[in-house]
Amino acid sequence: MSAPLSVAPRSAGTGRARGQRLVVGALVAALVLLLGAGWLLWDNRRLVVTEQAVEVAAIPEGGLRIAHVSDLHAADHGDFLDRLAAEIEQRDVDLVALTGDLIDMRTADLGSVLDLAEHLSAVAPTFFVLGNHEGDSALREELLAGLEDAGVTILRDEATSLEIRGTEVTVAGLEDRRVAVVDGRTPAQPAAVLDRLALESAPGPTVLLAHRPEFLAQYADHGADVVLSGHAHGGQVRLPLIGPLFAPHQGWLPALTEGVHRQGDTAMVIR
């Protein structure tokens, strides 16, 4: 004969404790999410200016001060763009470099970006190259026309020069290679364009605006003294102690995400 099955009722106290743990866990998770969202909102709106000195040959007397702005993605966060323009105006720069992704494919209004461009071009000669997000935007041509009206020099796989304190400085610009390929104009690799620009033959220092940093070796092989890039966002995924975990077009554990990098006589500054 089998033993009788005994079923004891669950303690009401045990059920309440489990329910309380679930509630506390949900509250903690919600708090973490709120704090994370708040930090991201604050981080996207804060303005941090990083000054970096780069040694190159044949620079103008007193050096060459460049304001480098990249990957704003139409960041009209309150007065952020106004503060950015005011900060650059105070810096007594020789030129301004806009290295792409001023807008993205979601941008619906160019007003704040074009106001910024007009302000900057009144401060110093201002140059712009297309990033990948402008290539995907339906407002690309409107943006280019607006930048020209604002006094910005647009460099689409071309170079120009200007004199700064008696020294001729060549400023060249490569638009994002994806834009060029979609337009059916140039190959995906920048080497062919750089061959045509012949920066190594320039009489003075050369500054190359190029949205994507992963082509550093090609930029260096073609005589660029200073390269200004963006695109990598400091690593779109970063981990404490490890640093950048992932960046677009570089993949996992990317090497070129921010700061100054050197190859031969070429210095690249990534924003």
Residue ranges of predicted features:
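N-terminal membrane-anchoring alpha-helices
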Residues: M1-A58
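Extended recognition/assembly regions associated with phosphoester-bond processing machinery
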Residues: R45, T50-V56, R196-L209, P213, ...
